[in-house]
Amino acid sequence: MYAVSTYMRRLRTSICFLSSEPTQRAAAAAEAAATMLARFGYTSSCKPASSSSSKPSAAATMNTSWRCRGASTGMVAGRREEEDEWRRYLAPERLEVLAHLEPWAEAHMLPLLKPADEVWQPSDLLPDAAALGADGFHAACLELRARAEGVPDAQLVCLVGNMVTEEALPTYQSMSNRFEATRDTTGADGTAWARWIRGWSAEENRHGDVLSRYMSLSGRLDMRQVERTVHRLIASGMAMHAPASPYHGFVYVAFQERATSVSHGNTARQVRGHGDVALARICGAIAGDEKRHEAAYTRVVAKLFEVDPDAAVRAMAYMMRRRITMPAALMDDGRDADLFAHYAAAAQQAGVYTTSDYRSILEHLIRQWRVEDLAEGLSGEGRRARDYVCALPEKIRRMEEKSHDRANRARKQPTPVPFSWIFDRPVSVMLP
């Protein structure tokens, strides 16, 4: 997912750069890039103009080789259409669907939360001074630090990125409370939806805590830079498409929970291979929580597909066309202007979270929600949305193969990128 979002953003940028090249070859390349974007579901607002037989100046080329359709008026109209599309989900009859599903949520979502006395806490997974005494705590910390020395920098960067994402929990609870019909309107509502939000937040809160404590004890990281990154991310917030629609929001969170489980699970396996059993246990425990949370959100979207299939599949297509924007996409350490892209590239390179994982998650959700089997109750728009979603994994697969082939032909070499989290040591990544 990280890789897909980064790739598509850079591809859009490349189209604009190519427009300044006063040759037909540049126009053809840019047209090919735009075509790839369109095939993947991301439309471009620009199209190539007809070329002249005489070679124009660079300035003239900038002005004439590409024409932007509709300019600002078209962009405003497009944004208005997008907003109108998802705002239709806020109609009373649509929100009543969620209100009627509250007893279902009570029976099928809340049981996936565990009582505080039954779940792990950070002190269960790390040395506890009160339990071990001064000498025992000191010895346990020395052992933890010795094992942490074996974890490569690439995995440390991915670990910090995951931890920063987890620590921005206040943003995610705020996001959940923007969903109409399911939000916690008073902060202490007794509805099943509101109790789920608070219970989910309580479980998620342990994830950033335990990772932060491990990092402090390990001595491998510049914790002040890590903490500044968390501070900036929470202050920056996050942007999500269709922010008030529970249909779109639940699709987004179902995808995100599975992505987080995959990322933490991969990290656990990798660091175990490098000898850090304590960190592997921590990441494995977090991944287990995320699997339960994924199950809850996957269930509620499956129920929406059952009771309102046309609206559900159109919401899914809407989100996939605009990409599942990562919650930590606005992360900033105050030094690297492209920090998230570099973190995403490190995750791709290390195999912690890859484009293939993004595709696999999409394929999994298509199966879980039986999207391919949808037929009855679909409008023409719903059928087109179904066909788009079901065709998307293969399009992503072809994009992966073409990107891999191009990289092999170009013999592209990794680029060393310094990360402030690890005292500006470089990590080699493949940049788009």
PLM region spans:
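Non-heme di-metal
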Residues: 2-21, 29-33, 37-47, 54-55, ...
